[in-house]
Amino acid sequence: MFMTYQPKKRQRSKEHGFRKRMKTKSGRNVLKRRRQKGRKRLTA
């Protein structure tokens, strides 16, 4: 067995980043919910 999580900054931000969230309606809803909840960090 090997470690399955091998982090990459670029891949992470491409998939879960702010700009990706802003692209879609549902993504904007995610940001809205996280703002309402008072999250310090909205996205990865």
Swiss-Prot record:
Keyword Ribonucleoprotein attributed: yes
GO biological process: translation
Region spans: Disordered: 1-44
InterPro entries cross-referenced by the UniProt entry: Ribosomal_bL34, Ribosomal_bL34_CS
Database matches in PROSITE patterns: RIBOSOMAL_L34 (PS00784)
Origin superkingdom: Bacteria
Entry-linked Pfam families: Ribosomal_L34 (PF00468)
Keywords: Ribonucleoprotein, Ribosomal protein
GO molecular function: structural constituent of ribosome
A single Gene Ontology CC term: ribonucleoprotein complex
Heme as UniProt keyword: no
Gene3D superfamilies, alphabetized: 1.10.287.3980
NCBIfam families listed in its UniProt record: rpmH_bact
Assigned protein family: Belongs to the bacterial ribosomal protein bL34 family.
Name assigned to this protein: Large ribosomal subunit protein bL34
Taxonomic source organism: Clostridium perfringens (strain 13 / Type A)
